[in-house]
């Protein structure tokens, strides 16, 4: 094809030469090593500052009724706080619950 019939000759004096004003015809970052890694790192940081609220006084001292106790070994559980389900399970297993309070 001769040069005079090529598309580039027809697009002379057109501002963006058929590649659009907004998107622009830019070189691809994919062939440039680690170029474009920034957005991947940005998505990693999305929940960087998210932190659930936890009551520190209940963190180590709250007993929840999620597990199970051995039936033949009685246990004495000492804690500041005990849930209703856990207290019920402990007493059914023949164990005891002792509520203790710490003064700060």
Curated annotation (Swiss-Prot):
One of its GO terms (molecular function) is structural constituent of ribosome. The keyword Ribosomal protein applies. Keywords: Ribonucleoprotein, Ribosomal protein. Gene3D superfamilies: 3.100.10.10. InterPro entries: Ribosomal_uL15/eL18_sf. One of its GO terms (cellular component) is cytosolic large ribosomal subunit. PANTHER family: 60S RIBOSOMAL PROTEIN L27A, LARGE RIBOSOMAL SUBUNIT PROTEIN UL15. Belongs to the universal ribosomal protein uL15 family. This is Large ribosomal subunit protein uL15z. It comes from Arabidopsis thaliana (Mouse-ear cress). The lineage of its organism: Eukaryota, Viridiplantae, Streptophyta, Embryophyta, Tracheophyta. The gene is RPL27AA.
